[in-house]
């Protein structure tokens, strides 16, 4: 029997059908991995690109994979893009805003952020002046139109401008001298030494300082001159301006005998010493150089210790 006759016979056809049925049953019983081992049953299209996990566009392989997922989970999975890692920016220097960098990076320009608000002018009409309230104050009632806060601006007070409050004049000595502490200023412009005080241009003719002795000045005309006058000692400067010094336990003044005998000068100097918190105040008489005989010199040496230093407290 020829091959052609055998293929056309009934026996060949029956065996062929049995082999096909067995192969179909084996295919159904086999467990295929998702995406692996199924290349023989998938027809890839050459025009479509290859499958990419990050690319959600469907390909031939992705369609087959979605159908397998649908039969397994009974739903079509949605494409998910994997999150990308954020690029870490370099940390800024914590003191970058304070310009603590190199000198080359410091900018010399000034930037102003903000806007100056414009002051609105209020139209005041129908002023009614009534002399009520305190004797030195005048109450003025105003009818302000076009504002919501009429009650706040309904009454304004004007004080009498003739009386002016005189502020106490402060001295220019630093706290490190008057209080005995460390200088609190970074670049101190106050005085740290008596020699740094500026000299008065009027010298002994200043109207706020009265010269009583060679080195002694008193306050005059209810005013204070913060400058140093001609031949004025530091003790006289502290008493005249009534500056308290922390470590000044006693103060010695060198005056002539006629100044010590004046009661008016003595009273004013003692009052300034109390305000300066100085105790005791010692008056020291100056020596007068004169030609004297030998008899007079012996009598003066006996009284020299009593008249040289006098404690007034």
From Swiss-Prot:
- Keyword Zinc on entry: yes
Composition bias (Acidic residues) maps to 296-313
Name of a matching Pfam family: Zn_finger_prot
- UniProt entry tagged with the keyword Transport: no
Coiled-coil boundaries: none
**Which top-level group of life is the source organism from?**
Viruses
- Key words of the record: Metal-binding, Zinc, Zinc-finger
Molecular function via GO? zinc ion binding
Annotated region described as Disordered, given as residue ranges? 294-313
Q: Where are the zinc fingers (C3H1-type)?
A: 174-199
Q: Which family does it belong to?
A: Belongs to the IIV-6 077L family.
Under what name is this protein listed?
Putative zinc finger protein 077L
User: What organism is the protein native to?
Assistant: Invertebrate iridescent virus 6
